[in-house]
């Protein structure tokens, strides 16, 4: 078992880039034999593929932090976060904090 800490700050692409960097460094450690073998404890976890329906934000009655995390973790290549308002659907592309304000980019369909 080889593990490395991973920050979950930033957008999904930022996290993926850090994962790739960590993976590369761990692969180098394995190739060079610089790791300690030990059996993994606990049970394996399996998750089904996320469906677009699971990306729906049912309401805006959540904290800004919750909405920020929901949108940023559902950016491409995953089905983007969206909310339905009347007959319109707003699909969120990104979210960020500017000072104390949550800013989002989206498309109205």
Protein language model features and the residues they cover:
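Generic C-terminus detector
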Residues: 103, 107-109
């Amino acid at each position: 078992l080889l593990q490395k800490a991973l920050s979950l700050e930033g957008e999904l692409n930022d996290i993926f880039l850090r994962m790739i960097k960590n993976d590369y460094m761990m692969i180098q450690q394995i190739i060079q034999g610089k790791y300690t073998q030990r059996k993994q404890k606990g049970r394996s976890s399996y998750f089904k593929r996320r469906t677009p329906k699971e990306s729906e934000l049912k309401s805006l009655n959540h904290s800004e932090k919750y909405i920020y995390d929901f949108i940023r973790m559902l950016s491409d290549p995953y089905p983007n976060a969206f909310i339905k308002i009347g007959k319109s659907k707003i699909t969120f592309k990104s979210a960020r904090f500017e000072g104390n304000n949550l800013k989002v980019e989206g498309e109205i369909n």
